Amino acid sequence: MLPGLFIHLAEADNSWRVVHTDGRPHLPPDELEPLYNGDETAHWEGDTLVIDSISLDERTWINPNGWFHSDQAHVIERLRRPSMNYMEYQYTVEDPKVLTKPWTSAWDTYSLSKGDLIENFCTNNENIEQLKKLHELESSKK
């Protein structure tokens, strides 16, 4: 956390998010451009950080299972830290083109690591030997 900013570093895929917590609204609709993390704003409700995201692009997964969404997706995340060692997380998805009503997850509790972030990357050619086998298999079908 920095004054006016929440910076979320993720160990997976070396990704990060920068979310403004200074009370600014979302961009006007004519200025929105779909982005992987969307247009994000945040505010505090007591000890809970509430992140509001719209304008998510088609690459975004709502959860780790690959839940798809439309251009009307609206995600509200809630993060709180009941102690120095734990973080709690909950999210609500509103998407009138995909869901009949808003859906809210249960609260998840995460133990916060005391170690360093480990580099983790994802590429399409990480395992060259596996790619060679796939290529040979495809070639044998011709």
Q: Where are the regions a protein language model picked out?
A:
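PEST-like low-complexity, intrinsically disordered acidic/proline/serine-rich tracts
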Residues: 1-142
